[in-house]
Each structure stands twice: as structure tokens, then as C-alpha cells.
Amino acid sequence: MINKLYIRTFGCQMNEYDSNKMVDILKHSHDLTLTDDATSADVLLLNTCSIREKAQDKLFHQLGRWSKLKNKNPNLIIGVGGCVASQEGELILKRTPYVDIIFGPQTLHRLPNMLNDALNNKKTSIDISFPEIEKFDHLPKPRTNSVTAFVSIMEGCSKYCTFCIVPYTRGEEISRPFNDVINEVKILASQGVREINLLGQNVNAYQGSMNDGEVSDLALLINIVAKISGIKRIRYTTSHPNQFSDSLIEAYAEVPELVSHLHLPVQSGSDKILRLMKRGYMSIEYKSKIRKLRKIRPDISISSDFIIGFPGENEKDFLDTMILIDEIGFDKSFSFIYSVRPGTPAASYPDDIDIQVKKQRLALIQKTINNNTEHISQLMIGSIQKVLVENITKKGNELFGRTENMRNTHFKGDKSLIGQIVNVKITKGRGNSLMGDLLTQI
């Protein structure tokens, strides 16, 4: 008899979304209840990410810890999913024969059958295939108690940037049908969700088939989602600059529910490095798109991703990146030292930059953007911000929510305001956090 499920998730928002779906699937099929205590669970699932270096090390370290639990309880079921499972399924089977289930991002809907096989046949069940996007046809209706929710609208990526493993672990771009996405949003809205975050590895490549034979792009999808009763905010992530289209920019003029925050990964400010990365644009094109957007939304917050120390990056290339950061004024960033992903084209490039130089460059970028974050937060003091109330604080004496530009905001108020957008006058700001006084409900 199995009762409790524990999931450990590494990586991106897509993995968080997938993990939530695993919970729904196994609740529906086996009535498993999620627990935050691995030692009390009957089923342990590890949802992995292969974007960063040492993903394998992280995986096998965690499995080593779980093997001790399995030694104490031979009936414990251990499963590995996600991108590392997709990439290294056979290696996982070889190195950790005590693992019962191995599945990829596109086969998580088959978990109930795989779990039954593991329970009944006592042998490892493995499925890391790429069956189009059929998993969405087999998922139970979403369930949530939150006022915010992710909705996956497409999977995979067809850009094949030289540094990126995603096309090899999640496959090429496949879009969910338009009506499937709309129906999921409607269900979530009926459960009290007020903010929807549309997800995809390359979300603005969305091309969802419609009943009339037409195809919806992301801009049209956003326009329709905004009309769904109860939806007050819309976000989307992650975007590629190449497909940040004029129609998508125009959506910021047409759809007030589309928040004034955009995450648009640039990776580098150097045209030479962008060519080596096979990004498909130059820095001037990136800046042009941001200028167009800011004509419509002058106050929009821009965040980005940066890869530091990509092979061939010299001082001039790094300076070009710093110049871009200064010109755009990024609010936040996810910045990492380049790490080789086996199987990608860039894995064959010579790693010709000293690690200390990479660390110094990373530190400078992070310091610069952290200063930007602090400066913007300080400028918000005295302003009135629209905050979506998400919950009460752990101490229970305040409410918290987020501004459109992703600032965590704390203020005193009644818990009946959860799920509402309220006006808050900002009184303090530090880093990514704000404090304020409640004014009125919108």
C-alpha cells in the first residue's frame, strides 16, 4: 500500500509545472498525497534539469542519499524524471540499479502505468521517448489553491543555440492547441487563480492550432486569455528575442492585464559572441525591440539572462555586454559562468578563458545589475503600486504579494484581500523587496 509522494525539483519554471502535474496525475491514479518529508514517503521522484554544469553530479548525489532510505525500506519506489533522465536514462539505470522508474519530460503522463510496473514486476521501468505532445491529452484537470498559476503552452525549442541542451532533452518546438490552453486557464480561473504565467522554452514561438483551421500566435492568445473572467494579470516566459514580434509588442498597448515586466534573455552584448552562440540577432536588434516596447510601456521592467566566459569572449566582448547592461538598465538577471553541455556544438569549442577571469566578470555583472535592482526599488519609495495579494506571511501578521515588476511586497491588511489587486503606498525598499501601506482595493 502506497500513500505518500515526495518530489524534489531542480531547474526552471517548466520543471515546476511538470512536478505539479506529476502530483495531480498520481493523486488521480493512486490517491497519493504530497509530503514535504522524504523519510515518510512511499514514492520519491526527482525532477531533474540539465541546463547547468554538474547536473549529473547533483542527480547522483541525491540518489545516493535516497539509496540509504531504500536500504531501510526495500519497498520504497524511487523515480527520476526531467531532462537529465531524458539525456542519461541508460547511465542512470547502469549506475543506480535501485532506481525503479526513469521517465522524460514528454512521458510523465505515463507515470501511473510505470508505477504499477515497478510495484508489480519489481524491475526498473524506463520511458524517455519523445511522443509529440500527447502528455497534455492524458493529464487530469488542474487543481490549485494559489492565486497564481503556470500554464504550459508549448514545449521544446528549435533554435539550437550552440550552448543549449534543451532541443536534445525536450525536443523541437510543439505548441498546444489553442482551445486546450484556454480551457486550462478557465478551470484555473474558476478555482481562484488571478495571475496566469504562460510557459514555454521559447514561449513566443507559440503557434497553436484553432478550430477554424487558423493558427494563434502568442499575442492573440494573450488577448483571449485577458478576456477570461477572473484573470487580472498575465505573464509569459521564456522568450527569444528573434520572435519578440511587433504583434507581441502591440499587445502591451492593447492588453492592460499584460504586466509591465518582460524577461528577454540576451546572453551577451557582443555580436561576435552572439554569432558563436547562434542566437540569430545582433545587439542593436535587441536594443531596437526594447526601444519599441518602451515607447508603449515607458515604465516596463526588463530582466535577462547572461552567459559569462563563453569560449572566445575577450575583454572587448565583455565590455560590449557591460555597455548593453548600462544602456538597457536591466532590473534583474540570471547570470552564469558558461558550462559545457555534452552533445552541444559549443562543447567542441576551446575553453580559452581563465576561471578567475570568468569569476571576476560574473561578479561585476551581478554587482552592476544588483545595483540597478536596488536603485529601482529606491525610486519606488513614495509611489503607489498595484499589488496582487497572494497570501499571509509566515508570521501571520501581514499580507504579501507582488508588484507588476516582480517586487515582493509586504503590508498590513485582512486576509480577505487574498486574490485581489490592491493599491499599496511603498514606504521602504531593499533589493527585490518592498514594504508599504494598504490604500484601496482596485
From Swiss-Prot:
Residues annotated as binding [4Fe-4S] cluster 1: C12, C49, C83
EC number: 2.8.4.3
Annotated MTTase N-terminal domain residues: 3-120
Keywords: 4Fe-4S, Cytoplasm, Iron, Iron-sulfur, Metal-binding, S-adenosyl-L-methionine, Transferase, tRNA processing
Alphabetized Pfam families for the sequence: Radical_SAM, TRAM, UPF0004
Tree of life domain: Bacteria
Domain named TRAM: residues: 378-440
Cellular component terms per the entry's GO annotation: cytosol
Keyword presence, Metal-binding: yes
Cofactor: [4Fe-4S] cluster
Assembly mode: Monomer.
Protein name stated in the entry: tRNA-2-methylthio-N(6)-dimethylallyladenosine synthase
Organism whose genome encodes this protein: Vesicomyosocius okutanii subsp. Calyptogena okutanii (strain HA)
Gene: miaB
